[in-house]
Curated annotation (Swiss-Prot):
Residues 255-425, 444-522, 571-646 are annotated as: Disordered. Residues 266-302 have a biased composition (Polar residues). The gene is Cfap20dc. Residues 444-461 have a biased composition (Basic and acidic residues). This is Protein CFAP20DC. It comes from Mus musculus (Mouse). Coiled coil: none annotated.
């Protein structure tokens, strides 16, 4: 627009609010209610008023993006009035001698100078408000100091956003005389045609990198250094900060920055955390392969290793003291989540085993056939896992060979998750190698039953639990059976054998006591039970008596499986495989399992309502699990089992005594008893 016009004079006027239609050449973005021309009595002339949001209400020159202004003079002056408490911003499109177009964003919103190879954000917090101001922008200085090696050629676009009053926009060939200016550089006065009236209070402010540095010092920050290093431009993300909580050298515009760049700091922290997790996993897997005497590792060593690695990367932070890590137990322990888990996207559905004390255990369930004594030992081993002492496990205890464990001691990558008592237990995991692991666990439990029983009685203070909910697989998809994510994963072939061969093992899980500290269910029992729930419990008891008398084991299930069908529905998995041998009991049943199965002879429901009733699902939403047997499925309230359908979801219902209904944590729905 101005490329072919003479620009050798003292100034070139770009915009003036005077005249019939001053915005004819401008593209106005905003309704007339927020952008209009009015006569200002203070300056005794017309002004353009822009109000509202600075992101939507603005004026742009030139109208078409294909056009360019071609303004070559060094200084751009905006004659504006910015009200108190309002944001203001302007955007300048400049072209350097290499014909590369770059943008300068000047805004009162920005608190620091930051730049990429093509964009720069410049703060305007030093601008004076509630007074008319000749804001003079040094285009040559910003171009050369922000974009390293660039030389200003022309100003090709201007965008002025709300909120402000705009009187004139023009360019100057020489630096204007600034208010309270003490520089010795040659200055010039603003041309008479562009000056405000002498009786109008106004100031002239020059904006360049030197002024920004001086303002930074005035506002209590550290001085900004001149552009000396190529690291600022080569990285494309250099910035100038107030250096709050950082060293002085972090606040360097173009100078050397010792720490990570601020804009990509979070990305670097995530990358460093990932590298630390991988290193910890690798070293722990090596520890598991060492001799027995060297396999007991304290958590302080692991914490020190993590702190050292983070300290080398410049991002060390305090670590919480956790329980010891016995490397000889092939079981990942609960840990305080600091960041979302790295395997967030996996489709594995984890089974949960709840104990009567409210703790969750993460265990390896074996599925080999053995005598009842061995199976009870397995239960003792499983239940004593979260009750580890704060000293290393004795090396003399026999242990199974530890497999490769990619999941041992995972340190999550992001903070902000709070622990929820309702979801305070780790998942129960099963592996393809569960046959072998079970036999090894049986042998181990025989020799170390007394040691583990003593450990069970000592509850450590620093037991950490998971705070994230277990996730289910998407509809229509089976779970991820690969062993890469967890030490044990469910195998479909093992599952069918579990269902058919191990009724004793199932009973062992329910009959054992998982903790010395009993869960006080009386604190969470509703004072009154509804009639529908009483009827349901009565029918449940009748069905239990009939099933106990029936020696034929109806529905094609073993006797222990029928017991499980009558006591609890699957509260864990929506997998297409059937997993009946390790179904967890309802949250408050624990050691009262036998008491519920054999109620007293008087048929008074209030005599045996001391425990929480099992989860009840409406018949229309009866949970169905696919079984490799022809007819193995669950039964609720004496109704016939629906036919097994593939990929049908199993509901996980939790009883809410306050609302007297059942809650599905996955869908957020509540179910009432009918």
């Amino acid at each position: 627009m101005f490329k072919n016009e003479y620009q050798g004079g003292a100034f070139v006027e770009i915009f003036s609010a005077q005249g019939k239609n001053p915005g004819a050449k401008w593209k106005i973005l905003g309704s007339p209610s927020v952008i209009w021309k009015e006569f200002d009595k203070e300056v005794k002339s017309f002004v353009f008023v822009l109000e509202g949001s600075s992101q939507t209400n603005r004026i742009q020159l030139p109208k078409e993006n294909k056009q360019i202004l071609g303004l070559i003079q060094r200084f751009l002056v905006l004659q504006i009035y910015i009200p108190l408490g309002q944001d203001f911003s302007t955007e300048l499109l400049i072209t350097d001698l290499g014909n590369i177009k770059r943008r300068l964003y000047l805004s009162t919103v920005h608190k620091e100078v930051s730049s990429t190879p093509l964009h720069a954000k410049i703060p305007l917090f030093m601008i004076q408000r509630k007074i008319w101001c000749n804001l003079c922008i040094d285009l040559v200085a910003f171009t050369s100091e922000i974009f390293k090696g660039a030389v200003f050629q022309s100003l090709d676009g201007i965008i002025v956003s709300a909120n402000c009053k705009l009187r004139k926009i023009f360019t100057l060939k020489s630096k204007p005389q600034e208010t309270a200016d003490k520089d010795d550089e040659p200055t010039d006065i603003i041309p008479r045609s562009c000056q405000l009236a002498t009786d109008v209070p106004h100031v002239t402010q020059l904006l360049n990198m030197t002024k920004l540095r001086q303002t930074e010092i005035k506002f209590g920050g550290h001085p900004l250094r001149s552009a000396e290093s190529e690291q600022f431009i080569s990285s494309g993300a250099g910035s100038v900060q107030n250096s709050k909580g950082q060293d002085v050298c972090h606040i360097a515009f173009g100078s050397r920055v010792l720490g990570p760049p601020p804009l990509s700091g979070r990305r670097n922290n995530l990358r460093q955390s990932t590298e630390t997790v991988r290193s910890i996993r690798y070293k722990n897997s090596q520890l598991c392969q060492q001799p027995t005497e060297e396999r007991s590792v304290n958590s302080t060593e692991v914490s020190a290793l993590l702190a050292d690695q983070q300290g080398e990367k410049g991002s060390a932070r305090p670590l919480k003291q956790t329980t010891p890590l016995p490397a000889k137990l092939p079981i990942p322990y609960p840990h305080p989540p600091q960041e979302p888990s790295a395997d967030k996207g996996s489709n594995r559905r984890r089974l949960r085993l709840k104990s009567s004390s409210g703790d969750r255990t993460e265990a390896h369930c074996g599925c080999s056939s053995g005598n009842n004594r061995s199976e009870e030992d397995v239960v003792m081993a499983l239940n004593s896992i979260p009750q580890l002492r704060t000293e290393p496990v004795r090396a003399s205890t026999p242990e199974p060979p530890a497999p490769e464990q990619p999941d041992e001691w995972i340190f999550p990558e992001s903070g902000g998750l709070t622990s929820d008592p309702a979801w305070s237990s780790p998942p129960l995991l099963l592996d393809e190698d569960s046959h072998t692991a079970s036999n090894l666990w049986l042998e181990t439990s025989k020799d170390s039953e007394h040691d583990q029983a003593e450990e069970t009685q000592r509850a450590p203070k620093d037991i950490f639990t998971f705070s994230s909910r277990p996730r289910s697989a998407p509809h229509g998809k089976s779970h991820d059976m690969s062993p890469k994510g967890c030490p044990f994963t469910l195998d479909t072939q093992d599952d069918s054998q579990v269902t058919k061969e191990d009724p004793k093992l199932e009973g062992g899980f329910y009959g054992s006591e998982s903790s010395e500290e009993e869960y006080n269910w009386r604190n969470y029992q509703p004072s009154q039970m509804s009639e529908s729930e009483l009827q349901m419990l009565a029918s449940l008891r009748r069905q239990q008596n009939e099933d106990l008398e029936d020696t034929g084991a109806p529905h094609g299930l073993s006797a222990s499986q029928v017991d499980h069908c009558n006591v609890s529905i699957s509260t864990s998995s929506d997998d297409t495989t059937t997993w009946n041998s390790c179904l967890p009991p309802p949250v408050n049943q624990g050691r009262h399992y036998q008491k519920e199965m054999n109620p007293p002879s008087p048929s008074n429901p209030r005599d045996w309502l001391n425990m929480l009733s099992p989860p009840i699902v409406p018949p229309s939403q009866q949970p169905v699990e696919q079984s490799l047997d022809s007819s193995a499925s669950l039964s609720v309230q004496g109704e016939e089992d629906p036919r097994v359908e593939e990929d049908e979801e199993v509901l996980t219902l939790l009883y809410d005594p306050c609302l007297n209904c059942y809650f599905d944590p996955q869908t957020g729905k509540y179910y009432e008893l009918v």
